[in-house]
């Protein structure tokens, strides 16, 4: 990606911070590209693959996202799409579909994704939403939301994608400080990924988000599905066209 499309080093900062918080996070760094003698900086970000999942201590499973096809249609095309098609989901890592078992897991994930109470099945969704509303609101758009399905628990883990990360004046509490050891480690990792030092604002955001995370993040191993959830389908998925 070109840096200006994702706020440059802020994208690297955000994915690294999510990793520190314990969220699965796509490996992201700044790289130098030489295209026919034209040298420029770009953002490298890994794909959501089996290797990504395993690096985050997750067994290979399905990653769901909403179908963003509708986003690219013109006004007339959208009318046709609304009349003839139902909202659908896309398997982000389609290489996962290898056999009947993986097909079943994907089908189960899609069925659960269509539930009215879906967001209650997403671990740490409230905290994830809170910090993205504050600093990376674009990442909460329906077409940018991705979810890793954990079949043996029947819950989902949020996966950040394309948040257009912005640190606007007046939104950050610079009174909150990150632990010295954490800050030192984070600064080292950030410099390795960007060849730049943390800015004062980035340091403030790190301290603020780490403070917000206190006693808010549930570890996957300690999370279990809520058996009282309503399994009724969201209305927009009930009428299959």
Q: What is the predicted role of each segment?
A:
Residues 1-13, 17, 75-88, 180-206:
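A short, charged
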Residues 1-81, 133-136, 152:
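Conserved ATP-binding subdomain of kinase catalytic cores across diverse folds
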Residues 7, 11, 26, 121-126, ...:
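Active-site-proximal structural scaffolding
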Residues 44-131:
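ATP-dependent phospho-/nucleotidyl transfer catalytic cores
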Residues 118-159:
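Active-site acidic catalytic loop and adjacent metal/ATP-binding pocket
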Residues 136, 148-241:
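C-terminal catalytic region of ATP-dependent kinase domains
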